[in-house]
Design a protein with these regions (language model features):
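Active-site glycine-centered loops adjacent to acidic/histidine catalytic or metal-binding residues
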Residues: 89, 188, 220
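Canonical P-loop GTPase G-domain recognition
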Residues: 192-244
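Conserved beta-strand segments of the P-loop GTPase G domain that flank and frequently precede/overlap
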Residues: 58, 110-111, 161-164, 186-189
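Nucleotide-state-sensitive switch-loop elements of NTP-binding domains
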Residues: 23-46, 51-59, 64, 68, ...
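Short, Lys/Arg-enriched N-terminal segments with co-localized hydrophobic residues
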Residues: 3-20
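Conserved C-terminal guanine-recognition region of P-loop GTPase G domains, centered on the G4
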Residues: 149-156, 165-213
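Conserved strand-to-helix beginnings and helix N-cap segments that scaffold or border functional pockets
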Residues: 67, 96, 120-121, 172, ...
């Protein structure tokens, strides 16, 4: 069945630290949900590799702290690598503006027209509106959802996810797919561990049941605890990818 979606791209251009908001570009997307997505994703991955651009697909449920984690992480690495961000949401440009104001890096907002994920073609359309010749690392903050984003290959070089303490340590058992495809699981909001029945050891155990190779990194995006480890992991991932 054809699935109609609208991907609206808010492009922010940066000149002398000023934001010039371009007019909204509206692109109609009409395709079957899974039609050729894996082929599209593989093709996009090869193109990005040829350009030397690493694409990180960051997933999580809503409210897990993706944007705050990105701000903390980007501010630790932006002097070492050229970074840009694509923010995917059903509506609003709040996160893209927040990223720009807090980090000063290029960011665009993708509106999915009600869809709960991005696929490879939608990701490509976002990348087409980015200054790719001036970027080494693009971080895609996918739509907040623990199910749909994991089902669609975006063409990323690497998948990451954030699990927050209030969500519970049993999420890897309930939502196995996302945990099984991620190279790293960031456990955010460890500053509130005393107030929740969250067992970090159980969380690690359950993550590794789904994905023995996944790295588990506890952090607090609010206090900054553990963010250095995630930033180091990301830089290592990019450098290792460049050598392959």
């Amino acid at each position: 069945m054809a699935n109609n979606a609208v991907l609206r791209i808010f492009t922010h251009y940066f000149e002398a630290n000023r934001i010039i908001m371009d007019s909204v570009k509206i692109i109609e997307i009409k395709k079957s949900v899974f039609e050729d997505n894996n082929l599209d994703a593989d093709a996009l991955r090869k193109e990005l590799k040829a350009k030397g651009v690493f694409l990180l697909n960051l997933m999580s449920s809503p409210g897990s702290g993706k944007t705050t984690t990105l701000i903390q992480t980007i501010n630790r690495i932006k002097d070492k690598i050229r970074v840009a961000v694509m923010e995917a949401d059903i509506d609003s440009d709040v996160d893209a503006v927040k990223i720009k104001e807090a980090t000063g890096i290029p960011s665009i907002q993708l509106h999915t027209g009600g869809m709960c994920h991005l696929d490879a073609e939608m990701t490509r359309q976002g990348l087409d509106n980015m200054p790719m010749e001036d970027v080494d690392l693009v971080i895609l903050e996918n739509v907040g959802n623990l199910v749909c984003p994991a089902e669609f290959d975006t063409g990323s070089s690497c998948n990451a996810m954030i699990l927050s303490v209030p969500e519970g340590h049993d999420k890897p058992l309930k939502y196995p797919l996302m945990f099984s495809i991620c190279d790293v699981v960031v456990v955010n909001k460890i500053d509130v561990l005393p107030y929740f029945d969250f067992d970090m050891d159980k969380c690690r155990e359950y993550v590794h049941m789904r994905n023995p190779k996944a790295r588990v990194i506890p952090i607090s995006a609010k206090t900054g605890e553990g963010v250095d480890e995630f930033a180091s992991w990301l830089m290592e991932a990019v450098n290792d990818w460049k050598k392959r």
